[in-house]
């Protein structure tokens, strides 16, 4: 597996990183101390990223991406900043993956069922335009549908064919895309990201220290991740063909992931309540207590816990 990556289009070299300006971080006054382990030093008030670490970490990240896709998974590319949009859109499309480039809609992952309704609506309008329905509608209604379609396409076009949650996220600029990272963390979806010196690496499963502002740097890493997806997809296709087209591995992974998300959601709810729920009394004890209350209510006996009246003082 490692050999395939090192010899193919996913190869990461020091020369390529230097030429793309990957080593240039942010000004020293705009840094996140948690990025200190990935910083080589400072020059002219700008932090220089340790490219030796970038090379090793990028290779690990690409290996993970390739293996995830080889198991039948998918990768969601996320980059809404202007200089990242074109690269994210082009490379995700080239590798047959999914992307978000306009803005991250809150709940894209954590409330995927609702987002799926928007996707279904987009497909319905597209079908209406293709099957001639538009021709039977008033022009005003067609114009309204087109405006709705354009808005949905802008926000959901990149995930239109996403039928289930992705196996991984690839993110450019984790500071800007912190909501996407948070949602992935909540669901246990691994995050691969290019992390600059002003970002927080916590919550990122595969940190790639590097410049997340320069277009050449963004294109370099986005292209490498796309190549890893293509390589993994080839292995997946070969595996499915060999096993008669039935993907038991992916089905089992879906079940395991759903189970893990369920456990995590229950733990989160318990933590928000302030700890585990108090143990309830056994059913027999609750029934007995209920009977005692009913007896007291009818006046048959006095409450056992009722204190005696205090004697009057002289």
UniProtKB/Swiss-Prot annotation:
The entry's cellular-component GO terms read: cytosolic small ribosomal subunit
Superkingdom, natural source: Bacteria
Query: Is the keyword Ribosomal protein assigned to this protein?
Result: yes
Report the PROSITE patterns cross-referenced here: RIBOSOMAL_S2_1, RIBOSOMAL_S2_2
Q: Where is the composition biased (Low complexity)?
A: 302-314
User: Which parts of this chain are annotated as the region Disordered?
Assistant: 244-314
Q: Check the record and name the CDD domains matching this protein.
A: RPS2
Name of the molecule in the record: Small ribosomal subunit protein uS2
What's the source species for this entry? Anaeromyxobacter dehalogenans (strain 2CP-C)
